[in-house]
């Protein structure tokens, strides 16, 4: 650990993201799941009710900046694994899907508590505000690049 703060930029933010993601992916691998499956399952589990498949796919593609075809394939895999269920175009998590989401959440919650231990709440709050602003600006830039490419 260092007390000298590195300059904040894409590399520093990316290193933190990929370190955290690697932890999550290790936990997920123990349960035979992937990162994209977990994000898709999270969207279904935390929804107020069943989601239209298109809305679920849109939510996940928006979060991950991934292709819709990839997310449709992920939904298909979760359906085949019995972690999601379909009623027509409506998708909902199964009990097994909720259980996997809860188990992974509990495991990663313990790890996250260790990762964030000892960091003053005001520093975490400031970091959250900065990252929210960076995300907002990056999403605006991505939208502009997408418009320009059309």
Language model regions located:
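N-terminal leader segment of winged-helix/HTH proteins
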Residues: 1-38
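C-terminal regulatory/oligomerization modules of transcriptional regulators
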Residues: 1, 51, 55, 125, ...
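Generic structural concept
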Residues: 44-45, 94, 128, 135
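Alpha-helical linker/hinge and terminal dimerization helices associated
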Residues: 16, 20, 104-119, 134-145
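Membrane-interacting alpha-helical segments
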Residues: 2-7, 89-94, 147-150
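Charged, amphipathic alpha-helical coiled-coil/dimerization segments
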Residues: 73-129
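N-terminal helix-turn-helix DNA-binding core of bacterial DNA-binding proteins
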Residues: 23-70, 75
């Amino acid at each position: 650990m260092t007390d000298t703060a590195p300059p904040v930029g894409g590399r520093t933010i990316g290193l933190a993201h990929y370190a955290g993601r690697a932890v999550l992916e290790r936990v997920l691998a123990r349960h035979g799941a992937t990162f994209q499956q977990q994000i898709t399952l999270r969207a279904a589990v935390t929804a107020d009710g069943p989601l239209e498949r298109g809305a679920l796919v849109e939510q996940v593609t928006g979060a991950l900046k991934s292709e819709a075809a990839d997310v449709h394939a992920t939904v298909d895999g979760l359906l085949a694994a019995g972690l999601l269920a379909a009623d027509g175009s409506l998708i909902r998590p199964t009990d097994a899907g909720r259980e996997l989401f809860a188990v992974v959440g509990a495991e990663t919650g313990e790890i996250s508590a260790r990762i964030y231990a000892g960091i003053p709440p005001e520093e975490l709050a400031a970091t959250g505000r900065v990252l929210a602003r960076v995300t907002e600006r990056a999403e605006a830039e991505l939208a502009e690049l997408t418009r320009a490419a059309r």
